[in-house]
């Protein structure tokens, strides 16, 4: 999926409830080119989303290996049907 479309969907669903793969609920807001997680002090930069979308088969483990910020949270966002369509 195109990063611009994914980012547009991510921004439009800011403030809504999302879940990590293990079911931990969280919300986020957008600040510039970052996802700011509201239940932790983590920020996920736009470039980490780009890197995650480049993976042929997405998993939390693979996101961890990419050394992205908040891999469990990022996974929860970019695999959610509101974001991927």
Which residue ranges define each predicted feature?
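Intrinsically disordered, charged low-complexity linkers and terminal tails
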Residues: 1-85
């Amino acid at each position: 999926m195109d990063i611009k479309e994914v980012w547009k969907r991510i921004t439009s669903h800011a403030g809504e409830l999302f879940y990590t793969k293990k079911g931990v609920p969280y919300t986020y807001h957008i600040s510039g080119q970052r996802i700011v997680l509201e239940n932790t002090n983590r920020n996920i930069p736009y470039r980490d989303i780009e890197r995650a979308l480049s993976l042929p088969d997405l998993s939390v483990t693979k996101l961890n290996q990419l050394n992205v910020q908040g891999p469990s949270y990022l996974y929860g966002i970019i695999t959610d049907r509101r974001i991927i369509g």
